Amino acid sequence: MNRVLYPGTFDPITKGHGDLIERASRLFDHVIIAVAASPKKNPLFSLEQRVALAQEVTKHLPNVEVVGFSTLLAHFVKEQKANVFLRGLRAVSDFEYEFQLANMNRQLAPDVESMFLTPSEKYSFISSTLVREIAALGGDISKFVHPAVADALAERFKR
């Protein structure tokens, strides 16, 4: 069984993430969305909230599972018995960091391959950071996130 692990902070999960997850769900038997605790990033939403939002966004995909984690990714991927890391590349600027990360992961988990997918063109400019900034300033984010995520952001930034 081909199991792919798609790690990220997902703060919040966007339609760009959702696009990659849907496509991965067609390519792999089982997709694990690994929501990282990432305390150094000081996330807007708690780990539990980010897991719940990712579950809501992916509930229509029967072969997708959402799991939170706070351990070393190389250990977590083995624990989850995944054989592929999935990473998204929005632009060339993402490649250098992702290439470095893939090589480090190869050292730490040599049996796990890294696979890169680019988002559909209509989502290539979306980032969680931009979504948070637009939401914080009262902008319309409905084109960029699932309605449940838009509601959570509106609640978070209530004035």
Swiss-Prot record:
HAMAP family, alphabetized: PPAT_bact (MF_00151)
UniProt xrefs under NCBIfam families: coaD_prev_kdtB, cyt_tran_rel
Annotated localization: Cytoplasm
Top EC category: transferase
Function: Reversibly transfers an adenylyl group from ATP to 4'-phosphopantetheine, yielding dephospho-CoA (dPCoA) and pyrophosphate.
Amino-acid positions noted as binding substrate in the UniProt annotation, renumbered to this chain: 9, 41, 73, 87
Protein's gene: coaD
Subunit structure: Homohexamer.
Protein family per UniProt: Belongs to the bacterial CoaD family.
Cofactor(s) this protein requires: Mg(2+)
Any single Gene Ontology cellular-component annotation: cytoplasm
GO molecular function: [citrate (pro-3S)-lyase] ligase activity; ATP binding; pantetheine-phosphate adenylyltransferase activity
Protein name, as recorded: Phosphopantetheine adenylyltransferase
EC number: 2.7.7.3
GO biological process, one term: coenzyme A biosynthetic process
Cited InterPro entries: Citrate_lyase_ligase_C, Cyt_trans-like, PPAT, Rossmann-like_a/b/a_fold
Catalytic activity: (R)-4'-phosphopantetheine + ATP + H(+) = 3'-dephospho-CoA + diphosphate
Pathway assigned to this chain's UniProt record: Cofactor biosynthesis; coenzyme A biosynthesis; CoA from (R)-pantothenate: step 4/5
Site (Transition state stabilizer): 17
Entry keyword Oxidoreductase: no
Main location (coarse class): cytoplasm
Keywords from the named record: ATP-binding, Coenzyme A biosynthesis, Cytoplasm, Magnesium, Nucleotide-binding, Nucleotidyltransferase, Transferase
Binding site for ATP: 9-10, 17, 88-90, 98, 123-129
Matching Pfam families: CTP_transf_like
